[in-house]
Amino acid sequence: MKFSPLVDELIQSLKCLPGVGPKSAQRMAFQLLERDRKAGSKLADSLGKAMSEVGHCQSCRTFTEETYCPICVSTKRGHSSVICVVETPADVLAIEAGGHFSGRYFVLLGHLSPLDGVGPDELGLALLETHLASGEVTELILATNPTVEGDATAHYIADMAKNHELAVSRIAHGVPVGGELEYVDSTTLALSFNGRLPI
């Protein structure tokens, strides 16, 4: 059976979301059309508004509706000498939820991936270089993901930071709290053994 062009367009549009295939997109579309048109209209309004009004902070590149995000304009954190480099705005939220970091961020919006056409320019590294050259930064914490691309990105930024007098560190990787060793992959176990701490 073929759907109407508008229904088909809605299904195709929903498939752009991560983890949403044809069947899931169809279920979502039918749920909104059959049972919750009010929520569907609210979703459309919110999505349209976010797409037109949400941009990137001109200092750290995270999501914001303003020129600068709340952290960068904060009197307590906006002038911190410590910058934590992350791959995505979601990483900022994860670190903020922990409440253990009180510095600034720099969001790469990805990682180095030459095969996908993602190089230093796409990651905004010229802006990061400007921050480092200002002399206001004393420490750079690299919190990229523990993947091949994340490691390559961290090494690239660490090399870039060598031109400046500042401490550069990488967040630790290892066994998660509450995790059982038998379920931890060998690479993570190796990192845990190599990065062990005295007690």
Swiss-Prot record:
Task: Tell me which Gene Ontology terms the entry assigns under biological process.
Answer: DNA recombination; DNA repair
Q: Cite the Pfam families for this sequence.
A: RecR_C, RecR_HhH, RecR_ZnF, Toprim_4
Q: Where are the zinc fingers (C4-type)?
A: 57-72
MF-aspect GO terms: DNA binding; zinc ion binding
Q: What gene is this protein a product of? A: recR
**Organism whose genome encodes this protein:** Shewanella piezotolerans (strain WP3 / JCM 13877)
Give the NCBIfam families listed for this entry: recR (TIGR00615)
Q: Is Secreted among this UniProt entry's keywords? A: no
Task: Spell out the Gene3D superfamilies in the cross-references.
Answer: 3.40.1360.10, 6.10.250.240, RecR Domain 1
What protein am I looking at? Answer: Recombination protein RecR
Domain of life (superkingdom) = Bacteria
Q: What does this protein do?
A: May play a role in DNA repair. It seems to be involved in an RecBC-independent recombinational process of DNA repair. It may act with RecF and RecO.
Swiss-Prot/TrEMBL keywords? DNA damage, DNA recombination, DNA repair, Metal-binding, Zinc, Zinc-finger
InterPro entries found in the cross-reference section: DNA_Rcmb_RecR, Rcmb_RecR, Rcmb_RecR_Znf, TOPRIM_dom, TOPRIM_RecR
Lineage at the top is: Bacteria, Pseudomonadati, Pseudomonadota, Gammaproteobacteria, Alteromonadales
Q: Which residues form the Toprim domain?
A: 81-176
Q: Which family does it belong to?
A: Belongs to the RecR family.
